[in-house]
Every structure is written in C-alpha cells, then in structure tokens.
C-alpha cells in the first residue's frame, strides 16, 4: 500500500453557484471530495489529507490529517466568492506538503477546477516543471468550464508527466447529474495504489466496503433489516384493517338482504291467503274453492302446472279471456255445468252459498253497468 499525503484544492469561486451539476457545482464538488478523502484514508490508515480553497487568498482549511470528519466539516463551511488563482493555490498546497510529518510519504495534489483559469499557459508550464522536480504529482478534475480550461490544463499535466510519466492525471467531466460517479471510475481513484478504492458505491452493499469498515457495514445491514420488518408489519396491519372493514360491511349487507327477503315474504303472506291443501278437500269443497277464487278475481294455478300451458295462457287473446270471465260470472251457466258434473251434488250447502254470492255479485254488476250507461 502506498503511503501518501494529499492536499485537496477546492474551487470556491462564484462559478460554483451554477446548476449544470446537480444540485450545484459546489455541492457536487463536496460529494466528490468526500469520496476522495475516504479513498485516500482507507487505502492506508497512515495516509493524510489536507484541504485548501483556490479562490481569493487560497485559505488552508485543514492541514494534513487522517481525520476525514474534520476535513468534511470544514468543507461544508465553504461559500462561493471571488475568482480562483490556480497557480497560487497549487504553490500553497505544495508548501503544505513540505511540512508533512511522514517524510517517506509521496506528495500528491488533487485540484478541483470548476471556473476559468486566468493564469497563462507559460506560467502553468513553469509551475509544472518545478513540481516535477520536487516529485509532486497533481490530479486535476476539470468540470464546468472544460472548453476554456482543457488546453491549458492538458499542457500542465503533460509537463508534469514528461515523456514516460503517468503519475498525474487530468479528468475532464462534462455536465451531468453526478460528478462523484465520474470521479469513481477515473484513474485518480483507480490509479497507483487505488485499485481497490476505485470501486463505486454500487459495487458494495449499502455503498460500504465490509472489509474496510465491517462495523458500519453491519450497522447498515441491521438497520435495513429492521426497516424491512417495520414495513412488513405495517403492510400486515393495513391488510388486517382493510379485511376487518370488509368483514363488518359484509354482515351488514347480508342482514339487509335478509330483512328485505323477510319483508317480501310477509307482504306475500298478508297480501293473500296461503294455498290450502287440496288433497285433503272433497270434490265439492274443491269446486267451491275454485268458484270463490274466481269471484275474488285471483288467478290460481298449481306449482305442478305445465309451463307450456301457462305460456299459452299468457299469449291468449285478451278479448277471449274477457268473454270467459263473463261466462264464469253467469250463475245460470254455472248451475247447468254443476248439474251435469258426475258425482257433484248441486244442493250441497257449500255450493249453494257460493252460487248465492255469485248471483248477488252479478246483480250488483248489472246495476253498476246500468248506472254507467245512464251517465253516458
């Protein structure tokens, strides 16, 4: 594992307010710096990282330290202001690296450039030659203003590397949703000593390498399991509640249906008398009952009647039904029919009472017909 001290230079100019990187260039840069700091410290526990701003006075926010929490807390206090002074910032970072505690540490500067570099190319090349002599590697993340800066920064990095050198890198990132994702797959994190650290967050469960931080990975796994159990419990409760509501509504519906059915049965029972047991009646009683039903105008049919006969009755001529009804209301006609029926005694008390009622009904109907004709 490579022992290395790294100074991270962040761009905090007014250009960092732009939103071509979500949500802004400044916040996208913060996420990328977070990844860089963790990558360097995890690659070797003895590695140190420092933080410096490039705008205005090039302020050193933190000196070299293995404490990434301290670095990130300072990083989130950075606010956009002024313009960057690239060459000055690189010189200050180089000076900070000279004061590193581990003299056997290699020196590296990682610079984020998200605004136009106003230094001319000649000054950049001169600075690169000096850094190469001091064996300082520089990685540059060029984003936001790549059209303006790419040519200058390419000359700077090529001078650092020389003909055969590969220690310094220039990564140009076009506008997009994530600066950090582009940085993860870049040679800056996957280069010398950083092969393990070039893995993206999607390559590990919960974005954490279990071998690097087993306690954090375990805590995240337990937290996710608890969250899954809570969601399943909430889903079961919701299903039980909906089932309970459906269970309450269903008996209510059945009760209302039963009540409606009982009401209909009661109406049928009180609206007309039930059918008598014809098998227990004598022939005279059956004839008397038939005549009584005819007088009341109630149609009577047995449940065992043939369907074809009933359909024929439904489709019969209305005029014919009216004639049959008039004939059945004629007492003399009925008397003659009863006398000709075998086994029927016309002098039976039940038959005579029905015939008397029929005669009186016919008399009333005749009077009513006369009154209606007189009114006309």
From Swiss-Prot:
Mind telling me which GO cellular component terms the entry cites?
cytosol; nucleoplasm; proteasome accessory complex
Q: Where is this cross-link: Glycyl lysine isopeptide (Lys-Gly) (interchain with G-Cter in SUMO2)?
A: 122
Q: What this chain does, per the record? A: Component of the 26S proteasome, a multiprotein complex involved in the ATP-dependent degradation of ubiquitinated proteins. This complex plays a key role in the maintenance of protein homeostasis by removing misfolded or damaged proteins, which could impair cellular functions, and by removing proteins whose functions are no longer required. Therefore, the proteasome participates in numerous cellular processes, including cell cycle progression, apoptosis, or DNA damage repair.
Q: Which GO terms describe its molecular function?
A: identical protein binding
Q: Where does the VWFA domain start and stop, copy by copy?
A: 5-188
| PANTHER family according to UniProt | 26S PROTEASOME NON-ATPASE REGULATORY SUBUNIT 4 (PTHR10223:SF0)
- Quaternary organization: Component of the 19S proteasome regulatory particle complex. The 26S proteasome consists of a 20S core particle (CP) and two 19S regulatory subunits (RP). The regulatory particle is made of a lid composed of 9 subunits, a base containing 6 ATPases and few additional components including PSMD4. Interacts with NUB1. Interacts with SQSTM1. Interacts with UBQLN4. Interacts with UBE3A. Interacts with UBQLN1 (via ubiquitin-like domain). Interacts with DDI2.
Q: What is this protein called?
A: 26S proteasome non-ATPase regulatory subunit 4
Q: Which Pfam families match?
A: UIM (PF02809), VWA_2 (PF13519)
Q: Where is this region: Interaction with UBQLN1?
A: 197-262
List every position bearing Phosphoserine.
Answer: 256, 360
Query: Which comment does the entry carry about domains?
Result: The 2 UIM motifs are involved in the binding to a multi-ubiquitin chain in a cooperative way.
Q: Which UniProt keywords apply?
A: Isopeptide bond, Phosphoprotein, Proteasome, Repeat, Ubl conjugation
Question: Which residues does the annotated region (Disordered) include?
Answer: 224-257, 355-376
Tell me which PROSITE patterns the record gives. UIM, VWFA
List compositional bias (Basic and acidic residues) regions by residue number.
224-237, 364-376
Sequence positions bearing Phosphothreonine: 250, 253
